[in-house]
A protein has these predicted regions:
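Conserved ATP-binding subdomain of kinase catalytic cores across diverse folds
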Residues: 24-131, 159, 163-164
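Surface-exposed cleft-lining segments at the edges of enzyme active sites
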Residues: 73, 140-146
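Juxta-kinase regulatory segment immediately upstream of eukaryotic protein kinase catalytic domains
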Residues: 1-39
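AlphaC helix of the protein kinase catalytic domain
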Residues: 129-141
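Catalytic-loop of the protein kinase fold
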Residues: 163-173
């Protein structure tokens, strides 16, 4: 896996990229600011998530905004939320565990203090959250064996993650995806609070 620093800077955001070209990043970032080709997944004051599609490949873009001056000062001495999530995703992938592949992380700082940060990850095709799958199973006449298989796979997966010394911090069924055709494959999402004990 080759990581390359990108010299593309717009609006004082410095980007680290892996897996997309600077041209695609520029196009994506321009689209974000012009609100085109983007679907708003979640929009809060401090966190915004967009889905962007480029050449039939989808990406999720998370933007975190610093809450207050104290958090901005603390950011001089700590990693941004986006950078923590970037690092955790690469550690998970290095441990042969699945997550959304991060392709870019960007930070906007002034005098070393963080203003906002971004992480861009590839969307996981053919997947659904474990929560959505459990709701679908409950509302349909899915055979009990399939339900039990999913639950047993999920329990085994969570045990395996913990056996690797990985503690998610926000482990719940909305932060886990599964492949709709293969319910033995799970992906962890929202890794910002993940701790690696081993």
């Amino acid at each position: 896996m080759q990581i390359a620093f990108n010299t593309y800077i717009k609006n004082d955001i410095c980007w680290l990229i892996n897996g997309i070209s600077p041209d695609v990043l520029k196009e994506m970032f321009d689209a974000i600011h012009e609100n085109r080709n983007c679907e708003v997944v979640r929009s809060g004051y401090y966190k915004r998530i967009l889905r962007y599609t480029h050449d039939r490949e989808s990406f999720y873009i998370k933007r975190y905004t610093v809450r207050n001056g104290l958090e901005s000062v603390k950011s001089i001495f700590s990693l941004s939320k986006a950078r923590r999530e970037w690092n955790c995703a690469h550690k998970l992938l290095g441990s042969q565990l699945l997550t959304a592949t991060p392709v870019a992380v960007g930070e906007k700082r002034r005098f070393g203090m963080l203003k906002d940060c971004y992480i861009i990850s590839k969307a996981i095709p053919n997947s659904t959250t474990v929560k959505e799958l459990l709701i679908a199973f409950r509302q349909s006449s899915v055979h009990a064996l399939k339900k039990n298989t999913l639950l047993n796979n999920l329990i085994s997966y969570v045990k395996m993650v913990h056996d690797h010394g990985i503690f998610h911090g926000e482990l719940h069924t909305e932060n886990m995806l599964t492949d709709v055709d293969n319910i033995t494959l799970f992906y962890l999402l929202d890794l910002g609070r993940t701790v690696f004990k081993k």
